[in-house]
Amino acid sequence: MLMTVNAARVTAVAVAAYVLILLKQYGHDWLVGSNGELFAVDFIGVWAAGHLAGAGAPAAAYDPALHALAHTAGLGHASAEHYPFPYPPFHLALAAALATFAYVPAFATWVAVSLTAYLWAAAGIVGSPRGALYMAACPAVLTNVYIGQNGLWSAALLGFGLVELERRPILAGVFLGLLAYKPQIAMLVPVALIAGGCWRALAAAALTVAALVIASLAYHGLATWQAFAAQLGAVGGLIAQTNLDVGKLQTLYGALRALGMPPQAALAAQIAAAAAAVAATFVIWRRPSPFALKAAGLAAATLMVSPYLFVYDLAVLMVAQAFLIRYAQDAGYDEFDLRGIVAANIAVAAVAFTSQPFGLAATLILAVVVWRRMALGRPAGLSIPSPA
């Protein structure tokens, strides 16, 4: 049989959940309303920053008032929502290129290219187009497509970097260096590379980041970086606010705040979790374990570090899932692992229906799956065929 009974049940549940998420996400106007008025989604923040950079005012991308005015240029009307641009100035070059298009074509280009890169990385990890289709079904992928966020870029860059690490370490380092566009996703990369003795990749990553910073300073000027630094301080203050919608933060900090814990105590717990993630990553990458498990562990631990992560960032968990599948193709499938992967995706999907930090549960589930696999070694596998 192509599928066991358990696999068929998993597929049926997955399809049903997928349909529910589609109805939840797309059951209303998207980008363009029935009256022809454009809607603002997260991508407008990137477009507006690129519009300002292209007009010769890159530092204005980090000025809330000027950035909000640029929203109007893209939408053709004022928007009640303001989507900031909290990314390093070297991201402005890509944003400016996108802003040469109108808002909707730029959005379509951004989503199409990021989804293609994500699927390409997934296929490279799993080793088959069918595996890439599975990766496309992750609920976090839908969120990124719907609002034009950058979670697919994060997953693609991390995936490309890890899949190339053993074969082409310098190219891998370039991909991992590019991940610095979102520092909270890249923080554990140096830990893993140092622990694993991946010195060529580490050097390539460091040189990539240095080149991006130098080029940005030369083109956009020091004032743009100063404006970026000032905005980071404002974001830090926002996280500590007592009236923050903490359900959107898919982190331990967000979960504890949602349960009523004061900001300072929740942040202390988050720092402890980050320290544990750093230690776990170092241990995993120092051990002579299968590379696929090391990569899966890094992807899962990555989302335990920062207090500032949202549902679209959970696309990074698909890198962990892809490497777990890659490992299982060689070592054999394990029923606990399969249930863990399904449970993690259900937890991510639950965010769309509840606006609560169930993404933390998904991260912890996959972390447990990785640690268990490392402890067990190579158990007898189930008779479930690999994706082909």
Residue ranges and their predicted role:
Residues M1-L171, L193-D330, R378-A388:
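Primarily membrane-embedded glycan-assembly and transfer machineries that use lipid-linked glycans
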Residues V5, L20, L178, E335, ...:
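General helical secondary-structure elements
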Residues I170-I194, L298-V305, A344-A350:
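Membrane-interface alpha helices of multi-pass inner-membrane proteins
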Residues Y181-Q184, A211-A215, L338-G340:
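Membrane-embedded alpha-helical segments of transport systems
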Residues I325-A388:
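Aromatic-enriched
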